[in-house]
Amino acid sequence: MSSSLTIFFFFFASTFLYTSSNSFNITNILNEHDDFSNFNQLLSETQLASTINKRQTITVLVVSNGALSSLSGQPTSVIKKILSLHIVLDYYDQKKLKNLSKKTVLLTTLFQSSGLARGQQGFLNATVMKNGDVAFGSAVPGSSLDAQLQDTVAALPFNISVLHISSAIMIDVKGDNAPTASPLSPVSSPPRPAESPNDDGQDFDEPPSSAPGAAADEPSENAGSANGVSRNDSQPAFAFTLLMSFIWWFMARLR
């Protein structure tokens, strides 16, 4: 076996091991939390779960079963747009959000990248309130910050962060032309009112050219073990086994 072929194989195996070790599955993550079973089911039904799993860096804002009443009776096309607004195209954990330098940030979501958003519909406003809590709301002018950050569901810096918020963030997407489907079963619990923010400035999270631009805050330095993240553990194990088998075979050929 030539040395160039050996180097190529080791490079390929190392890359595969690195990629596999950072993989995640949002369905498996939420399967560990019964209170998010409805949200988890909707992600699968709208095929957003597979989209999330293909991303290398993502933040998912999840809503408990008792706080999904605002999505009751909505067609699948509307639900998909609303849920995609809860998928942020960057990594944000609690520490990063609570330490925003300007106390507020504009977040780019999957809905914005779909090309279906109108105006500021594809962006979220995250703001640190006077009491230190973090609240979310649509970036559409006149929208309130109704969704409060509750806690962390899972985190794998800097690949995926799953955060529990108090209510779904709603925008008006019913006027869009899209196919409809059967409505959902009703759920209960209205959203909470929001507090007034303590800072009027905005710090933007890399929005496209159509939105006002500014730099986002740097990721928080809390890398380490994933809190509650369910990884695709079989892939790294298989890759490691494959690599070790090749090394054993290669060493045997050298004898």
Curated annotation (Swiss-Prot):
One of its GO terms (cellular component) is side of membrane. Glycans are attached at N25, N99, N125, N159. This is Fasciclin-like arabinogalactan protein 14. Residues 197-206 have a biased composition (Acidic residues). It comes from the Eukaryota. It is found in: Cell membrane. InterPro entries: FAS1_dom_sf, FAS1_domain, Plant_FLA. Residues 222-231 have a biased composition (Polar residues). The lineage of its organism: Eukaryota, Viridiplantae, Streptophyta, Embryophyta, Tracheophyta. Pfam families: Fasciclin (PF02469). Gene3D superfamilies: FAS1 domain (2.30.180.10). May be a cell surface adhesion protein. Its main location: membrane. Keywords: Cell membrane, Glycoprotein, GPI-anchor, Lipoprotein, Membrane, Proteoglycan, Signal. Residues 24-169 form the FAS1 domain.
